[in-house]
Amino acid sequence: MALSNMDVKGTSSVTDPDGTEKKSVTFNTTPPMSVYLLAFAVGDFVHVENNNDFRLPIKVYSTSDKAISQGQYAADLTAKCLSFLEEKFGIALPVPKMDGLALADKQGAMENLGLVTYAEASMLYDPHLTPLSRKAALSSTIVSLEAQRWAKDH
């Protein structure tokens, strides 16, 4: 699977000179943005999607099945946060989707437009195993990164 700032425009099969069949993925063009916000990832990802009525699909991806069992809180909180910020500032996000990617070997987080990258510990939450203090830290990380879009990136 390939992820980037924008949604997938199309896919095609390509054959390498050695005869290996591969998949080519083309993404829609990003709106004007700072170059440092460009993000892409390729891997075997699983995901969960937000459960509320926000206008954009919000998905949390991970390289493990943890996204399915532990990504729901982050997906739902991101949708609530973005809904609030869009309403408060009267500026809609200029992308057709918002994904979060939890990475096992990453430290911190980066607010890439359309594809935010997080350390697994900063995005995945299991209500039966994770301390409440980590839920609070996760919430703070998500809210501060999303708020930066209006205070820093626009």
Regions flagged by a language model, labelled:
Residues 1-140:
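Hydrophobic helix-coil surface modules that form long, contiguous segments used
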Residues 146-154:
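Catalytic Zn2+-binding segment of zinc metalloproteases
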